[in-house]
Amino acid sequence: MIDVNNFEYMKIGLASPDKIRSWSYGEVKKPETINYRTLKPEKDGLFCERIFGPQKDWECHCGKYKRVRYKGVVCDRCGVEVTRAKVRRERMGHIELAAPVSHIWYFKGIPSRMGLVLDMSPRALEEVIYFASYVVTESGDTPLDKKQLLSEKEYRAYRDRYGSTFQAAMGAEAIKKLLQDIDLDKEVDFLKEELKTAQGQRRTRAIKRLEVLEAFRNSGNEPSWMILDVLPVIPPELRPMVQLDGGRFATSDLNDLYRRVINRNNRLKRLLDLGAPSIIVQNEKRMLQEAVDALIDNGRRGRPVTGPGNRPLKSLSHMLKGKQGRFRQNLLGKRVDYSGRSVIVVGPNLKMYQCGLPKEMALELFKPFVMKELVEKGLAHNIKSAKRKIERVQPEVWDVLESVIKEHPVLLNRAPTLHRLGIQAFEPTLVEGRAIRLHPLVCTAYNADFDGDQMAVHVPLSSEAQAEARLLMLAAQNILNPKDGKPVVTPSQDMVLGNYYLTLEREGAIGEGMVFKDANEALLAYQNGYVHLHTRVAVAASAVNNATFTEEQKSMLLLTTVGKLIFNEILPESFPYINEPTNSNLEKETPAKYFVEKGANIKEIIASREEVAPFSKKILGNIIAEVFKRFQITETSRMLDRMKNLGFKYSTKAGITVGVSDILVLGEKDEILHEAQAKVDNVIKQFRRGLITEEERYDRVISIWSNAKDVIQGKLMKSLNKRNPIFMMSDSGARGNASNFTQLAGMRGLMANPSGRIIELPIKSSFREGLTVLEYFISTHGARKGLADTALKTADSGYLTRRLVDVAQDVIVREDDCGTDRGLLIGAIKEGNEVIESLYDRLVGRFARKTVKHPETGEVLVAENQLITEDIAHIVENSGVETVNIRSAFTCNTRHGVCKKCYGRNLATGTDVEVGEAVGIIAAQSIGEPGTQLTMRTFHTGGVAGDDITQGLPRIQEIFEARNPKGQAVISEIDGVIAAINDVKDRQEVVVQGEVEARTYAIPYGARLKVTPGQPISHGKELTEGSIDPKELLKVTDITAVQEYLLREVQKVYRMQGVEIGDKHVEVMVRQMLRKVRVSDAGETDVLPGTLLDIHQFTDANAKVLLQGKQPATARPVLLGITKASLETDSFLSAASFQETTRVLTDAAIKGKRDELLGLKENVIIGKLVPAGTGMNRYRKVDLVKTTQDDMNVENDEVYVEQ
């Protein structure tokens, strides 16, 4: 066999009859499979041992030769070679067909490749191949044309008139003769001439034909090989026959299909030998053709061949197609050994990098390691006795297991794995019971909860795999989320509540204004009940262990609370003492107002001050991000563990709980509802008098009730006590929000009906008061829709992720700097006056393309090619600079990937991106993972056009698939001024007056205008409200405008839903959609007009002819949707495993395509290491040196000081 790592590329082509015979180990002559009595394979049958190899290792059919010592002997009695049984997985056979048969892929595919080569219509081909018409193969000196179709009647008439001066035939033989007669060079030259003059349909047909003929000419495939003389038979182990319990046999459908072919083939041979009448022979040939069609692709033509119970049989094509096909089931998604799964429970006492592994599971997973260790320690004599010891679970096994799993990380995975944080590595600790223990902080990344979720465990075996798991995948390393660079391990729920409660302040609490010499004294006072956690006290600043205090501050007293003293102990020493939830306190130092002179009247000062807000979830997240920025991973993960412990401890101590009495019904509610009802009655009156339309009435009613609900919500939030448990839960960010309270204590408000239209009867009751029957019924609509939508959304979002991954999977950081001189001009993204994404957010972690200067002073803020850090970005934004020219993936020149400079910082680590990082996959995951959080459809607020523009997930799909948007905007094709807006019949027309010409645009019915007469407009800008069709925009403007538009639109959808995604991820995806051009004129190059080419291939072809001083080709950029872009990729393996498998393979075979194995999928499919990360060639040459125990100890001390 070929070694996986030794081949450079993979090529696919058409097989010639001789090639098929050379693969074969013998001809299959009989349709029999196995003998029903002996259960041994029949000779010359579909499972014949002589052809395919022995069924048992080292044993021939008749049993004359048994044992390894006869290796390679061919038995003289039964003719079976003595060898391993696994050759039955690779040895092929063949069937010599009595008549040529056409291959359905090439005859039936769209477009029909055979039809294009012969310049015949698929209808005509079908008539010939299935013996309905004759085709003239040689016209001789008759008035007939070559390739002319004749019916049976006409054929007889011409035969009688002209005798044998012409030749006509039917069936695949006739087609084969025509294919052999074709002179490719002559045809190609003829077509190239025709292209110079042809227009319209003739031109497109010529381009298609030229493409196929060129493919045959360049690939060395013969057109006549599309007709089969010999049929290959795949190895028997790939179409197995197994005995079931009841003695019956289950067999692969392929055996049935092969059997039909062999039966018909043998019958045809016999008929030909007997010299049967031609009509019988023709019928048999047609049946053979149909049998071969069914074998190759059952159901492609006519009704599929069915098995028992009318189930269509699965043919060779079905074996490759779809989720259950060879590609996606076995090559891209393999099942692995050394894995297990179990329910997860919370492990609050674990460290960040640990997980609890059930003992029996660990023993099974680490069995080989334990066996080896038992033998090495002398506790067992050999592997066999070690295995027995483990199976009997003897006590010494547990000690060995302990030592084996130490330092051996395991991977935990939770399905669905939406982004790379769905698989992380942990150090296992053995636990009793049968459940896996999971650290509470990693739940967010896994999106896990403990209501019965299950997780899978995998063991990395090789030392390289263990090293990668430890250094790259350890949970303590994955603190930032790759999609936005924010911490993903923020505390949630109980932990948030505990820290919130701990940092509360309360006016007039017990012991207010006491002064302590240090934190310990304050704690002592708290434990003895002299002060409360929330009491505002003073502590000598010198005793608080904090390096950010100045000398002057150290001589003063620090005003704080007991809880904040406890909270600040978890932070590193050189971090500011956090006394208030503000950014300045976090980033710079504790504000000066919290320091007072010793001897001042503390009680008075405290009493005169407002309470400081406690720390909510958002603030905790900011603290984590800031600690990470300053102290890197180890310190952060330690601080996180401490924060978790504090949270759990104090949420327990707080005893915060919810009771019915916490929900207080608003007193003024009735009054507000009365007012609203009166307004509604008024609107209805106006409607009845005909003053307003039905639509206006509906809209006004809806807005009146919405406003009433908002008023109630505002009053309710004001009336809630700051100590109300429910308020605390919501305010801290632990659970719940304002709208939940309004429903509990105010009113439920308006509901939508199943179609998404809002019902104008509001639900006036709250849950506290209870709903009436009608109200309950109305609210069930919305609830049911919510559940149904969620289910649909998950599937949609998963499919979107799959397409995104597919289109970007070969984008890898390939080099340090591509040396481009282009950049992307960026500013804040705005929608009206609202800033959707600020300039700061867009700048952080990017490289400047041009020097940025201060607009007033002219001082250099950022040099060319300098990384823009958070601090620099703040300075730039505050200086009043509107736009900055940065390096971007859009303008990167690197082939098959991006360079470090154009990509910028790796969001997951906060450092420069490494060469070899698979940024395409990361981008796809970052865009796909939040997909489930996006809403499904818009709520229709009545039938107002313009409001119904698609939002949420459907809009994202619309953008990435480059579909025509719903509610499409009309755009201007020229720069100019709006000259006039005219009313024509029932619609409007906008006239744009340019410098040279005027253009008139018809505005579709119901669209809203965005422009007024006399207003200047530039090309590519909208005249009406709505979404622009990016394809239109590309025609009118250039690539840059389209890239920016797509980026802006994607960001709009996500930011509106409160999801942050780094620009660079969207840039990587959009770049993949715009990497092709369509050749409009070939010039003197080798490229064909009308073909899609990669931009790089196109520039290469042009560079070649320009050097010879010839005419270059011209092309237009093309925007492809992600599905189309995936199928147009250079790698046929990647495309075939994505969608439309048969079409992709048909095409690739004719072109004789080479797959250079550049992307990730192609390499996974053939079983190579992926060419990203450490699998890249530049890293593969590294030698691994085993470190000694001393080195290991030093390293471990660095990684975990706390072990």
Swiss-Prot record:
Binds 1 Mg(2+) ion per subunit. Binds 2 Zn(2+) ions per subunit. InterPro entries: DNA-dir_RpoC_beta_prime (IPR045867), DNA-dir_RpoC_beta_prime_bact (IPR012754), RNA_pol_asu (IPR000722), RNA_pol_N (IPR006592), RNA_pol_Rpb1_1 (IPR007080), RNA_pol_Rpb1_3 (IPR007066), RNA_pol_Rpb1_3_sf (IPR042102), RNA_pol_Rpb1_4 (IPR007083). Mg(2+) binds at residues 449, 451, 453. The keyword Oxidoreductase does not apply. Keywords: DNA-directed RNA polymerase, Magnesium, Metal-binding, Nucleotidyltransferase, Transcription, Transferase, Zinc. Zn(2+) 1 binds at residues 60, 62, 75, 78. It comes from the Bacteria. One of its GO terms (molecular function) is zinc ion binding. Its cofactor is Mg(2+); Zn(2+). This is DNA-directed RNA polymerase subunit beta'.
